[in-house]
Design a protein with these regions (language model features):
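Conserved small/polar residues in nucleotide/adenosyl-binding loops
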Residues: 359-361
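Alpha/beta enzyme core
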Residues: 36, 46, 171-187, 232-355
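Active-site-adjacent beta->alpha loops and helix N-cap segments on the catalytic face
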Residues: 138-147, 196-209, 255-268
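Glycine-rich, proline-tolerant flexible connector loops at the mouths of alpha/beta enzymes
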Residues: 189-206, 327-336
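N-terminal small/glycine-rich loop or linker at the start of catalytic domains
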Residues: 69-72, 141-165, 283-296, 328-330
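A cross-domain feature marking catalytic cores of carbohydrate-active enzymes
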Residues: 161-163, 192, 222-226, 247-248, ...
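Long, compositionally biased, glycine/small-hydrophobic-enriched stretches that function as flexible linkers
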Residues: 1-142
Protein backbone atom coordinates (compact mmCIF):
# COMPACT_ATOMS: atom_id res chain seq x y z
CA UNK A 1 0.00 0.00 0.00
CA UNK A 2 1.62 3.23 -1.20
CA UNK A 3 0.45 6.45 0.44
CA UNK A 4 2.54 8.95 -1.48
CA UNK A 5 2.89 10.39 -4.97
CA UNK A 6 4.93 12.99 -6.82
CA UNK A 7 3.00 15.84 -8.38
CA UNK A 8 4.26 19.08 -9.94
CA UNK A 9 7.78 18.26 -8.77
CA UNK A 10 6.71 17.80 -5.15
CA UNK A 11 6.26 14.60 -3.15
CA UNK A 12 2.98 14.33 -1.23
CA UNK A 13 2.93 11.70 1.50
CA UNK A 14 -0.04 10.78 3.71
CA UNK A 15 -0.02 9.12 7.10
CA UNK A 16 -3.03 6.83 6.73
CA UNK A 17 -5.89 5.69 4.51
CA UNK A 18 -8.15 7.91 6.61
CA UNK A 19 -6.06 10.96 5.72
CA UNK A 20 -6.06 10.04 2.03
CA UNK A 21 -9.85 9.74 2.06
CA UNK A 22 -10.24 13.08 3.82
CA UNK A 23 -7.88 15.04 1.61
CA UNK A 24 -9.22 13.49 -1.60
CA UNK A 25 -12.66 14.88 -0.79
CA UNK A 26 -14.03 17.82 -2.76
CA UNK A 27 -13.72 21.00 -0.69
CA UNK A 28 -16.29 21.18 2.12
CA UNK A 29 -16.41 23.81 4.83
CA UNK A 30 -17.17 21.04 7.33
CA UNK A 31 -13.92 19.25 6.58
CA UNK A 32 -12.10 22.56 6.91
CA UNK A 33 -13.76 23.10 10.29
CA UNK A 34 -12.74 19.60 11.37
CA UNK A 35 -9.14 20.22 10.30
CA UNK A 36 -9.02 17.29 7.89
CA UNK A 37 -9.37 19.02 4.49
CA UNK A 38 -6.59 19.26 1.93
CA UNK A 39 -4.50 22.40 2.40
CA UNK A 40 -4.45 23.16 -1.33
CA UNK A 41 -5.93 22.06 -4.63
CA UNK A 42 -2.60 20.42 -5.44
CA UNK A 43 -2.72 18.33 -2.27
CA UNK A 44 -6.32 17.37 -3.06
CA UNK A 45 -5.30 16.14 -6.51
CA UNK A 46 -2.36 14.25 -5.02
CA UNK A 47 -4.68 12.55 -2.53
CA UNK A 48 -7.02 11.58 -5.37
CA UNK A 49 -4.09 10.05 -7.26
CA UNK A 50 -3.07 8.00 -4.22
CA UNK A 51 -6.68 7.00 -3.53
CA UNK A 52 -7.22 5.89 -7.12
CA UNK A 53 -4.32 3.43 -6.80
CA UNK A 54 -5.36 1.91 -3.47
CA UNK A 55 -6.80 -1.59 -3.60
CA UNK A 56 -10.25 -2.29 -2.22
CA UNK A 57 -8.58 -4.62 0.28
CA UNK A 58 -6.63 -1.63 1.63
CA UNK A 59 -9.93 0.10 2.40
CA UNK A 60 -11.46 -3.09 3.83
CA UNK A 61 -8.52 -3.54 6.19
CA UNK A 62 -8.35 0.13 7.21
CA UNK A 63 -11.80 1.42 8.21
CA UNK A 64 -11.74 5.00 9.45
CA UNK A 65 -12.91 3.81 12.88
CA UNK A 66 -11.37 0.52 14.11
CA UNK A 67 -13.54 -2.60 14.13
CA UNK A 68 -12.81 -3.27 17.79
CA UNK A 69 -13.92 0.20 18.87
CA UNK A 70 -17.06 0.87 16.88
CA UNK A 71 -20.43 -0.84 16.43
CA UNK A 72 -21.08 0.81 13.06
CA UNK A 73 -17.78 -0.50 11.68
CA UNK A 74 -18.63 -3.99 12.90
CA UNK A 75 -22.04 -3.89 11.21
CA UNK A 76 -20.53 -2.68 7.93
CA UNK A 77 -17.74 -5.29 7.89
CA UNK A 78 -19.89 -8.17 9.14
CA UNK A 79 -22.53 -7.54 6.47
CA UNK A 80 -20.09 -7.73 3.55
CA UNK A 81 -20.66 -10.72 1.27
CA UNK A 82 -17.22 -12.30 1.38
CA UNK A 83 -17.70 -14.34 -1.79
CA UNK A 84 -18.28 -11.13 -3.75
CA UNK A 85 -15.50 -9.30 -1.90
CA UNK A 86 -12.96 -12.01 -2.74
CA UNK A 87 -13.64 -11.44 -6.44
CA UNK A 88 -13.00 -7.70 -6.29
CA UNK A 89 -10.57 -7.17 -3.41
CA UNK A 90 -7.58 -6.67 -5.71
CA UNK A 91 -9.30 -4.00 -7.80
CA UNK A 92 -8.06 -0.46 -7.38
CA UNK A 93 -10.53 2.30 -6.59
CA UNK A 94 -9.92 3.62 -10.09
CA UNK A 95 -10.89 0.25 -11.57
CA UNK A 96 -14.02 0.21 -9.43
CA UNK A 97 -15.01 3.60 -10.82
CA UNK A 98 -14.45 2.46 -14.40
CA UNK A 99 -16.44 -0.72 -13.81
CA UNK A 100 -19.44 1.13 -12.39
CA UNK A 101 -19.48 3.68 -15.22
CA UNK A 102 -19.00 1.08 -17.97
CA UNK A 103 -22.18 0.88 -20.07
CA UNK A 104 -21.96 -2.91 -19.99
CA UNK A 105 -22.73 -2.88 -16.27
CA UNK A 106 -26.26 -1.97 -15.29
CA UNK A 107 -28.60 -2.36 -12.33
CA UNK A 108 -28.31 -6.07 -11.50
CA UNK A 109 -24.54 -6.07 -12.06
CA UNK A 110 -24.01 -3.12 -9.73
CA UNK A 111 -26.35 -4.56 -7.11
CA UNK A 112 -24.32 -7.76 -7.13
CA UNK A 113 -21.12 -5.73 -6.76
CA UNK A 114 -22.47 -3.66 -3.87
CA UNK A 115 -22.71 -6.74 -1.66
CA UNK A 116 -18.91 -6.88 -1.53
CA UNK A 117 -18.31 -3.22 -0.72
CA UNK A 118 -17.71 -1.46 2.57
CA UNK A 119 -18.69 2.14 3.20
CA UNK A 120 -15.09 3.29 2.85
CA UNK A 121 -14.98 1.79 -0.65
CA UNK A 122 -18.25 3.51 -1.55
CA UNK A 123 -16.96 6.86 -0.29
CA UNK A 124 -13.63 6.38 -2.06
CA UNK A 125 -15.14 5.81 -5.49
CA UNK A 126 -17.48 8.78 -5.02
CA UNK A 127 -14.46 11.02 -4.42
CA UNK A 128 -13.05 10.07 -7.83
CA UNK A 129 -16.25 10.94 -9.67
CA UNK A 130 -17.34 14.17 -11.29
CA UNK A 131 -20.86 15.45 -10.67
CA UNK A 132 -21.92 13.95 -14.00
CA UNK A 133 -20.32 10.61 -13.08
CA UNK A 134 -22.34 10.57 -9.85
CA UNK A 135 -25.57 11.27 -11.72
CA UNK A 136 -24.94 8.60 -14.37
CA UNK A 137 -23.86 5.95 -11.85
CA UNK A 138 -26.73 6.57 -9.43
CA UNK A 139 -29.24 6.48 -12.28
CA UNK A 140 -28.17 2.95 -13.18
CA UNK A 141 -29.30 1.61 -9.81
CA UNK A 142 -32.99 0.85 -9.29
CA UNK A 143 -34.09 0.49 -5.68
CA UNK A 144 -37.71 -0.30 -4.87
CA UNK A 145 -39.03 -0.53 -1.33
CA UNK A 146 -42.47 -1.37 0.00
CA UNK A 147 -44.37 -0.43 3.14
CA UNK A 148 -48.01 0.15 2.10
CA UNK A 149 -46.92 1.81 -1.12
CA UNK A 150 -44.02 0.90 -3.38
CA UNK A 151 -41.47 3.60 -4.16
CA UNK A 152 -38.42 3.78 -6.39
CA UNK A 153 -39.82 2.49 -9.67
CA UNK A 154 -38.23 4.07 -12.77
CA UNK A 155 -40.11 7.12 -13.99
CA UNK A 156 -41.82 7.75 -10.67
CA UNK A 157 -41.36 10.38 -7.96
CA UNK A 158 -42.60 10.13 -4.38
CA UNK A 159 -43.00 12.83 -1.76
CA UNK A 160 -43.36 13.24 1.98
CA UNK A 161 -46.26 15.26 3.36
CA UNK A 162 -45.00 17.16 6.42
CA UNK A 163 -47.89 18.89 8.26
CA UNK A 164 -45.82 20.36 11.08
CA UNK A 165 -47.50 22.71 13.54
CA UNK A 166 -45.94 25.11 16.04
CA UNK A 167 -48.00 23.73 18.96
CA UNK A 168 -48.91 20.25 17.66
CA UNK A 169 -52.53 21.39 17.50
CA UNK A 170 -54.52 18.47 16.02
CA UNK A 171 -56.86 20.69 14.00
CA UNK A 172 -53.94 22.64 12.54
CA UNK A 173 -52.08 19.44 11.73
CA UNK A 174 -55.08 17.93 9.99
CA UNK A 175 -55.78 21.11 8.01
CA UNK A 176 -52.23 20.94 6.61
CA UNK A 177 -52.61 17.21 6.03
CA UNK A 178 -55.78 17.62 3.96
CA UNK A 179 -54.27 20.46 1.96
CA UNK A 180 -51.14 18.42 1.22
CA UNK A 181 -53.06 15.38 0.05
CA UNK A 182 -55.16 17.68 -2.15
CA UNK A 183 -51.93 18.56 -3.97
CA UNK A 184 -51.12 14.88 -4.45
CA UNK A 185 -48.31 14.85 -1.88
CA UNK A 186 -47.66 12.17 0.71
CA UNK A 187 -47.40 8.88 -1.17
CA UNK A 188 -43.97 8.25 0.35
CA UNK A 189 -44.95 9.31 3.84
CA UNK A 190 -47.29 11.34 6.00
CA UNK A 191 -44.74 12.37 8.62
CA UNK A 192 -44.85 15.02 11.33
CA UNK A 193 -41.90 16.56 13.21
CA UNK A 194 -43.41 16.95 16.68
CA UNK A 195 -42.90 19.84 19.07
CA UNK A 196 -43.82 17.60 22.01
CA UNK A 197 -41.75 14.40 22.02
CA UNK A 198 -43.84 12.71 24.73
CA UNK A 199 -45.42 9.30 24.31
CA UNK A 200 -48.94 10.66 24.84
CA UNK A 201 -48.58 13.37 22.20
CA UNK A 202 -47.01 10.90 19.76
CA UNK A 203 -49.85 8.43 20.30
CA UNK A 204 -52.49 11.11 19.79
CA UNK A 205 -51.09 12.22 16.44
CA UNK A 206 -50.49 8.66 15.22
CA UNK A 207 -54.13 7.80 15.95
CA UNK A 208 -55.30 10.96 14.20
CA UNK A 209 -53.25 10.17 11.09
CA UNK A 210 -54.33 6.54 11.01
CA UNK A 211 -58.02 7.38 11.37
CA UNK A 212 -57.78 9.82 8.46
CA UNK A 213 -55.87 7.36 6.26
CA UNK A 214 -58.37 4.58 6.95
CA UNK A 215 -61.44 6.78 6.51
CA UNK A 216 -60.37 7.95 3.07
CA UNK A 217 -58.50 4.75 2.12
CA UNK A 218 -55.31 6.65 1.32
CA UNK A 219 -52.45 4.42 0.09
CA UNK A 220 -49.57 5.66 2.21
CA UNK A 221 -47.78 5.17 5.54
CA UNK A 222 -47.54 7.55 8.47
CA UNK A 223 -45.01 8.43 11.14
CA UNK A 224 -44.37 10.85 13.99
CA UNK A 225 -40.68 11.71 14.03
CA UNK A 226 -40.23 11.47 17.78
CA UNK A 227 -37.21 9.72 19.29
CA UNK A 228 -37.10 6.04 18.39
CA UNK A 229 -37.61 4.97 22.01
CA UNK A 230 -40.71 7.17 22.23
CA UNK A 231 -42.10 5.53 19.10
CA UNK A 232 -41.40 2.03 20.46
CA UNK A 233 -43.30 2.83 23.65
CA UNK A 234 -46.16 4.35 21.66
CA UNK A 235 -46.42 1.16 19.59
CA UNK A 236 -46.31 -0.97 22.74
CA UNK A 237 -49.25 1.08 24.03
CA UNK A 238 -51.25 0.39 20.90
CA UNK A 239 -50.53 3.41 18.71
CA UNK A 240 -50.90 2.58 14.99
CA UNK A 241 -47.52 3.22 13.34
CA UNK A 242 -46.57 2.94 9.68
CA UNK A 243 -42.85 3.73 9.76
CA UNK A 244 -40.39 4.15 12.62
CA UNK A 245 -38.04 7.13 12.33
CA UNK A 246 -34.58 7.88 13.68
CA UNK A 247 -31.68 10.17 12.79
CA UNK A 248 -28.51 8.11 12.47
CA UNK A 249 -24.76 8.73 12.40
CA UNK A 250 -21.74 7.03 10.90
CA UNK A 251 -20.14 6.05 14.20
CA UNK A 252 -21.18 4.40 17.45
CA UNK A 253 -20.33 7.59 19.34
CA UNK A 254 -22.56 9.59 17.01
CA UNK A 255 -25.45 7.20 17.52
CA UNK A 256 -24.92 7.34 21.28
CA UNK A 257 -25.26 11.12 21.04
CA UNK A 258 -28.61 10.52 19.32
CA UNK A 259 -29.55 8.22 22.20
CA UNK A 260 -29.65 4.73 20.71
CA UNK A 261 -27.65 1.75 19.48
CA UNK A 262 -28.25 -1.03 16.97
CA UNK A 263 -30.21 -3.12 19.48
CA UNK A 264 -32.73 -0.31 19.88
CA UNK A 265 -33.14 0.03 16.11
CA UNK A 266 -33.63 -3.73 15.79
CA UNK A 267 -36.24 -3.61 18.54
CA UNK A 268 -38.03 -0.80 16.70
CA UNK A 269 -38.03 -2.76 13.44
CA UNK A 270 -39.24 -5.95 15.11
CA UNK A 271 -42.02 -4.09 16.91
CA UNK A 272 -43.16 -2.28 13.75
CA UNK A 273 -43.24 -5.51 11.78
CA UNK A 274 -45.24 -7.17 14.54
CA UNK A 275 -47.82 -4.50 15.39
CA UNK A 276 -47.38 -1.73 12.78
CA UNK A 277 -49.82 -0.73 10.06
CA UNK A 278 -47.50 -1.21 7.07
CA UNK A 279 -47.63 -4.39 5.02
CA UNK A 280 -43.87 -4.13 4.75
CA UNK A 281 -41.35 -5.59 4.67
CA UNK A 282 -39.64 -2.16 4.85
CA UNK A 283 -40.72 -0.28 7.97
CA UNK A 284 -37.76 1.92 8.95
CA UNK A 285 -37.17 5.58 8.10
CA UNK A 286 -33.71 7.07 8.67
CA UNK A 287 -32.40 10.60 8.37
CA UNK A 288 -28.75 11.47 7.71
CA UNK A 289 -26.74 14.45 6.53
CA UNK A 290 -23.08 15.27 5.96
CA UNK A 291 -21.46 16.79 9.03
CA UNK A 292 -23.73 15.53 11.79
CA UNK A 293 -20.93 13.49 13.38
CA UNK A 294 -18.76 16.60 13.75
CA UNK A 295 -21.56 18.24 15.74
CA UNK A 296 -21.15 15.58 18.44
CA UNK A 297 -17.37 15.24 18.04
CA UNK A 298 -18.01 11.72 16.75
CA UNK A 299 -16.23 11.88 13.39
CA UNK A 300 -12.99 10.28 14.63
CA UNK A 301 -10.89 12.51 12.38
CA UNK A 302 -12.64 11.30 9.22
CA UNK A 303 -14.17 13.48 6.51
CA UNK A 304 -17.91 14.03 6.28
CA UNK A 305 -18.43 12.14 3.01
CA UNK A 306 -16.88 8.99 4.44
CA UNK A 307 -18.91 9.31 7.63
CA UNK A 308 -22.06 9.81 5.55
CA UNK A 309 -21.32 6.64 3.58
CA UNK A 310 -21.02 4.82 6.90
CA UNK A 311 -24.53 6.01 7.80
CA UNK A 312 -25.83 4.10 4.80
CA UNK A 313 -23.76 1.08 5.76
CA UNK A 314 -25.44 1.12 9.18
CA UNK A 315 -28.89 1.67 7.65
CA UNK A 316 -28.47 -1.27 5.26
CA UNK A 317 -28.61 -3.73 8.18
CA UNK A 318 -32.24 -2.71 8.80
CA UNK A 319 -33.47 -2.64 5.16
CA UNK A 320 -35.24 0.75 5.47
CA UNK A 321 -38.14 2.09 3.41
CA UNK A 322 -36.70 5.61 3.35
CA UNK A 323 -33.29 7.18 3.93
CA UNK A 324 -33.47 10.95 3.82
CA UNK A 325 -30.26 12.96 3.54
CA UNK A 326 -30.95 16.49 4.74
CA UNK A 327 -28.27 18.08 2.57
CA UNK A 328 -27.27 21.50 3.92
CA UNK A 329 -29.81 21.40 6.75
CA UNK A 330 -27.25 21.85 9.53
CA UNK A 331 -25.85 25.05 8.09
CA UNK A 332 -23.05 26.75 6.17
CA UNK A 333 -20.41 25.63 8.66
CA UNK A 334 -20.60 22.18 7.00
CA UNK A 335 -21.76 23.02 3.46
CA UNK A 336 -20.99 26.66 2.80
CA UNK A 337 -22.69 27.42 -0.50
CA UNK A 338 -24.87 26.02 -3.28
CA UNK A 339 -21.89 24.43 -5.03
CA UNK A 340 -21.04 22.39 -1.93
CA UNK A 341 -24.71 21.54 -1.29
CA UNK A 342 -25.21 20.29 -4.85
CA UNK A 343 -22.05 18.20 -4.70
CA UNK A 344 -23.07 16.71 -1.34
CA UNK A 345 -26.54 15.87 -2.63
CA UNK A 346 -25.13 14.05 -5.65
CA UNK A 347 -22.60 12.20 -3.49
CA UNK A 348 -25.25 11.15 -1.01
CA UNK A 349 -27.66 9.97 -3.70
CA UNK A 350 -24.99 7.88 -5.40
CA UNK A 351 -23.56 6.44 -2.18
CA UNK A 352 -27.02 5.67 -0.82
CA UNK A 353 -28.05 3.90 -4.02
CA UNK A 354 -24.83 1.91 -4.20
CA UNK A 355 -25.02 0.88 -0.53
CA UNK A 356 -28.72 0.19 -0.11
CA UNK A 357 -29.27 -1.75 -3.34
CA UNK A 358 -30.18 -5.15 -1.96
CA UNK A 359 -30.72 -8.25 -4.07
CA UNK A 360 -31.07 -11.85 -3.02
CA UNK A 361 -28.88 -14.37 -4.81
Amino acid sequence: MILKTKLFGRVYEFKSVKEVLAKANEYKSGDQLAGVAAESSEERVAAKVVLSQLKLSDLFNNPVVPYEEDEVTRIIIDDVNLRTYEKIKNWTVSELREWILDNKHQNVDIQWLSRGLTSEMVAAVAKLMTNLDLIVAANKIIITKRANTTIGMPGTFSSRLQPNHTTDDPDGIMASTMEGFAYGCGDALLGLNPVDDSVESTKRILHKFNDFIEEYKIPTQHCVLAHVTTQIEAMNQGAPTGLVFQSIAGSEKGNEAFGFDAKVIQEAKDTAQKVGTSAGPNVMYFETGQGSELSSDAHHGADQVTMEARCYGFAKRFDPFLVNTVVGFIGPEYLYDSKQVIRAGLEDHFMGNLTLSLIHI
